[in-house]
Swiss-Prot record:
Keywords: ATP-binding, Chaperone, Cytoplasm, Isomerase, Nucleotide-binding. Belongs to the chaperonin (HSP60) family. Together with its co-chaperonin GroES, plays an essential role in assisting protein folding. The GroEL-GroES system forms a nano-cage that allows encapsulation of the non-native substrate proteins and provides a physical environment optimized to promote and accelerate protein folding. Its EC number is 5.6.1.7. ATP binds at residues 29-32, 50, 86-90, 420, 501. Gene3D superfamilies: GroEL, GroEL-like equatorial domain, TCP-1-like chaperonin intermediate domain. One of its GO terms (molecular function) is ATP binding. It catalyses: ATP + H2O + a folded polypeptide = ADP + phosphate + an unfolded polypeptide. The gene is groEL. This is Chaperonin GroEL.
Length: 552
């Protein structure tokens, strides 16, 4: 396919056009008074959503150059979503506004590298300021936990209170998962037996939920082994039995590679529900953790050389089972069945054994690792069961529950800051003392200072108000706890009004926006594919769309 190189003012103009499109479309969803956006689908009616991340992914311009720029800007929202699971709308607003302002300065003849350096200098100052503004969230104050979740869930108090209830049940380090409820229309919290460990899927081809890039297995069998699996022959008998059963298979091994991994992937693509992860931990600790998982899931054996049991002799009765397993690129969560007495007895026996080891151990390090294992086995898993009247309602509500859960975890991890966009607005004042090494570097610093007010401007605009007056009043009061509550239409104390944001979400949104915007700011040219003649002839615009490169 032929392509063309676009640079100079034509490229800068395209940057500004696309950035303005993203700002107006994604920004329209921001805040409690944000709007919904309809996204057309290849089949059925359009999806109507207020999720900024979905809207960002739904923007697909016709012009190849614009499409390439949108894809690059979308990386900011995607990275923000991957890192913290929330803040994608704020990130998109910051990214697009930074690109617009920088592009104007570059078009005026200023040096792009100096501008980028100024932006990077400002970034370091702002990140420190956000950290200094944050305060720890207390798990004793469940109303604060609930409020963070309510804001992220677009004001849904039921979601906020349910997440606070789940956090209360499992604690700060506890595991909370989300699943769709069968039969119920309500949002329920259920405490069940389970475990989470920090190992992700060994191949993205195992993914069952492409939108969330996760593996979700219901009622799977579990094969647990200390061995490294690199040939498929020993696995064939159990794979055949799994295929006949119609249930998924989840493999935990030292590693799965070579022929074994490629064969599992091929069978997954052909319809077999299968996934594999590396075993958690290292050395003797890994062996003990695998025994913990075997107890939790009811597996008869952890397959190892010392047992003398061959993999090809395994039957389904030898494997473990679970209610469900969810795997992301970083973590695995196993939810067991509470009704299984044998499993519960084995888990209790392991818990008592670990407690005895803690009492007799003389090593502080060993005690710490034993306590970690104890917490994983005894802490349980809180399951948020999402119900609704229709499948569409359940899906939309589940998305909001997951966003709110991510925000709550971020708040517990790094604390909270005043919400409503004021954290970034107030942080901008720290740039007044920052000295640039050149006038063009100062332009970069000034761009960041201006862009930091973009989120609150958009929130106020969506409420139908004039932002200049509100921002001027907030700054003059010199009170960093003062916010403008766009829902109640009044000035208020952030904590009293419950308008708070997780510091981690604000930090990641800003940091990611700077990273992606800087990449585009320093882009001199873009190489884009020309549409082929067949596509062009069949388009409504015909060949005329290419005239003067207007098709870009």
């Amino acid at each position: 396919m032929a392509n063309i190189v676009v640079s100079g003012e034509q490229l800068q103009e395209a940057f500004r056009e696309v950035a303005a499109m993203v700002d107006s479309t994604v920004g329209a969803t921001a805040g409690p008074r944000g709007n919904t956006i309809g996204i057309s689908k290849p089949y059925g009616g359009p999806e109507v959503t207020k999720d900024g991340y979905k809207v960002m992914k739904g923007i697909k311009p016709e012009k190849p150059l614009h499409s390439a720029i949108v894809s690059t800007i979308a990386q900011s929202a995607s990275q923000c979503n991957d890192k913290v699971g929330d803040g994608t709308t704020t990130c998109s607003i910051l990214t697009s506004n930074m690109i617009m302002e920088a592009s104007k300065s570059i078009a005026a003849g200023n040096d792009r590298i100096c501008i980028k350096n100024g932006i990077q200098k400002a970034k370091d100052v702002i990140l420190k300021e956000i950290t200094s503004m944050s305060r720890t969230i207390s798990l004793e104050k469940m109303d604060e936990v609930a409020q963070v979740a309510i804001i992220s869930a677009n004001g849904d108090k039921d979601i906020g209170n349910s997440i606070a209830d789940a956090v209360k049940k499992v604690g700060k380090e506890g595991v909370i998962t989300v699943e769709e409820s069968k039969g119920s229309k309500e949002l329920e919290v259920e405490l069940t037996t389970g475990m989470q460990f920090d190992r992700g899927y060994l191949s993205p081809y195992f993914v069952t939920n492409n939108e969330k890039m996760s593996v979700e297995l219901d009622d799977p069998y579990l094969l647990i082994t200390e061995k490294k699996l690199n040939i498929i022959q020993p696995l064939l008998p159990i794979l055949e039995a799994i295929f006949k059963s119609g249930k998924p298979l989840f493999i935990i091994a030292e590693d799965v590679e070579g022929e074994a991994l490629s064969t599992l992937v091929i069978n997954k693509l052909r319809g077999l529900k299968v996934a594999a992860v590396k075993a958690p931990g290292f050395g003797d600790r890994r062996k003990e953790m695998l025994e913990d998982i075997a107890a939790l899931t009811g597996a008869k054996y952890v397959i190892k050389d010392e047992l003398g049991i061959k993999m090809e002799d395994l039957t389904l009765e030898d494997l473990g089972t679970a209610k469900n397993v969810k795997i992301t690129k970083d973590n695995t969560t196993i939810v067991s069945e509470d009704s299984d007495c044998d499993k519960q007895n084995r888990v209790n026996a392991r818990i008592n054994q670990i407690k005895s080891q803690i009492e007799t151990s003389t090593s502080d390090y060993d005690k710490e690792k034993l306590r970690e294992r104890l917490a994983k086995l005894s802490g349980g898993v809180a399951v948020l069961k999402v119900g609704g009247a229709t499948e569409v309602e359940v899906k939309e509500r589940r998305d909001r529950v997951e966003d709110a859960l991510h925000a709550t975890r971020a708040a517990i991890e790094e604390g909270i800051v005043p919400g409503g966009g004021v954290a970034l607005l107030y942080a901008a004042s720290a740039l007044d003392k920052l000295k640039a090494s050149s006038d063009e570097e100062q332009i970069g610093i000034n761009i960041v200072k201006k862009v930091l007010s973009a989120p609150i401007k958009r929130l106020v605009k969506n409420a139908g108000l004039e932002s200049a007056v509100i921002i001027d009043y907030l700054i003059k009061q010199n009170d960093k706890e003062l916010i403008y509550n766009v829902e109640a239409m009044n000035y208020a104390n952030a904590s009293t009004a419950g308008v708070i944001d997780p510091a981690k979400v604000v930090r990641i949104a800003f940091e990611t926006a700077v990273s992606v915007a800087s990449a585009l700011i320093t882009t001199e040219s873009m190489i884009v594919d020309l549409p082929n003649k067949e596509e062009n002839a069949s388009s409504p615009m015909g060949a005329g769309a290419m005239g003067g490169m207007g098709g870009f």
